[in-house]
Every structure is written in C-alpha cells, then in structure tokens.
Amino acid sequence: TGQIPKWDLSKVRGAGEPLKTFGGRASGPQPLDDLFHFASRIFQDSAGRKLKPIECHDIVCKIAEIVVVGGVRRSALISLSDLNDREMRFAKHGEWYKLNVQRALANNSVNYKERPDVGTYMREWLSLYDSKSGERGVYNGVSAKNQVALLNEREKDGNGGYVKRREPRDDFGTNPCSEIILRSREFCNLSECVVRRHDDVESLKKKVRSATILGTFQSTLTN
C-alpha cells in the first residue's frame, strides 16, 4: 500500500559531459534513473513482507553497477550468505548473466559459522562446480575468529598478558577478495605496490611499509 516517490534528475550532469577532476566523461542521469526503477520494482513485489537476502543483494549490486567515475568502475562487493540460503547459493547458476546481469558486480560466498559435516561441504562444492561460474565460494567464519584470537597473542602488555586489539567474539567478515578479516562496517586497507626494474629488496620493503601505512590511514577516512 506504500507509494513510490517521484524523482527529479534534471540537475545531474548530462551524459558525455567532461569530468575536470577525474577525467573522462559523465554517465548522465540514465543509470541513476534505471536504479530507482529497479529498486522500486523490488519494493513493489515485496509489499507486505521483509526483503529477502537475494533481493537486498540485487539492489546493492545494481547500486554498484552505476558507481562509476569517468567510465571506471568504483565499486567492489562480496555477499556472505547463510548455508541454508538456496537463492543465494544459486544466484549465479544458469543464465543469470542475461536475466540478472547486475549480479556480476559481486563475489558470492557461503559463510560457515561452524564446521560443516563432509556431506554438506561436498554438496556446496558440487553446487559451485555445477554453476560454471565458480560461485558460491566458501568463506570460513570460524577460521577468521580463530585467526583473530591468534593475533591477540602477539603483543605482550608487560603484565604477563597480551594486548587485546580485536574482540574474537565479533562476527568477522572480509573484503571482496577475501584477503583481509574485517569487522562489520569496517573498511578495507588493501593496497598495491608497483614493482619497477630497478627495485631491490630494500626498496620493495620501503614501498610495502609505506603502502601499509597509507592503506590503514585511508581505511579510516569515513564518517
């Protein structure tokens, strides 16, 4: 019974207009208009009930699809889903790339919160194989918590104990490529170093150290 609000995109920079700061050309208002219509259809179809995980997933993927600057994609996603969520398991089965092309914007993985039995684990891997897309992948949430517990035993506090920098009881996730353990709403500090021909071990160490500091600092730049 809800109403869909109207929107005015007349002040959005027109398609093809130059971007002075980032370079490239503007995408124009059409992608944003497509997103609003896409989300509205899902909201209408789900009237009277909560959104399903797959519906939330599709909306977030559609948002990521339009987040571009100068024609360059500026988004990266991963969806961690429950073991018993069949719709997320089969999100990239069949001709999803024709019917739900926005799903290409996210990696999908099941999040194991406890060690599964062999049969359950093998069924998940068979589903991954049958999809021909390499997804849903597997993220071991239990292992992430165990790793955090080990990190808390690295730095002594001078009183016979250790400095507890992370709470091992937190529900940890990961960045879109699953290299980094993250808390809820925490930002990725992933950085990249360019190796030049003249680099040696010492110069590479310096680059990695600088990138680590910069990446950690940049991950805090949010309100």
Each predicted region: which residue ranges?
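Conserved, charged catalytic cores of large soluble enzymes
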Residues: Q30, D34-F43, K62-G161
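Short alpha-helix boundary/capping segments
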Residues: G23-P31, L182
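Flexible, glycine/charged-enriched surface loops at secondary-structure junctions
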Residues: G2-D8, S46-I59, V67-S79, T220-N223
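Charged, amphipathic alpha-helical regulatory modules used
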Residues: P18-A26, E55
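Generic recognition of stable, solvent-exposed alpha-helical segments in well-folded globular domains
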Residues: Q30, D34, F38, I54, ...
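Function-dense linear segments that define catalytic or interfacial modules
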Residues: T1-T21, D130-N223
